[in-house]
Amino acid sequence: MKTTRKGLRDGELEKDTYGRLTCSECGESLKKKNDPDEVFSVRICADCGREWKELR
């Protein structure tokens, strides 16, 4: 699983005009899954199911 920064650099993710992360493949806004036991959150695309981790 890649980080959101690496996804932005590779062109897999984009930011919209309000700074929200969107999937470049399907254009959907990413959902956030927060596990309190982990150091990172997981950003998930609802349409294609791809995941990226985001350090808090």
UniProtKB/Swiss-Prot annotation:
It comes from Haloferax volcanii (strain ATCC 29605 / DSM 3757 / JCM 8879 / NBRC 14742 / NCIMB 2012 / VKM B-1768 / DS2). The keyword Zinc-finger applies. InterPro entries: HVO_0758-like. Consists of an N-terminal alpha helix with several positively charged amino acids that is placed on top of a globular core, which is stabilized by the zinc finger. Zinc-binding protein that binds one zinc ion. Is involved in biofilm formation, swarming and glycerol metabolism regulation. This is Zinc finger mu-protein HVO_0758. GO terms for molecular function: zinc ion binding. Transmembrane segments: none annotated. A motif (C(P)XCG motif) lies at residues 23-27, 45-49.
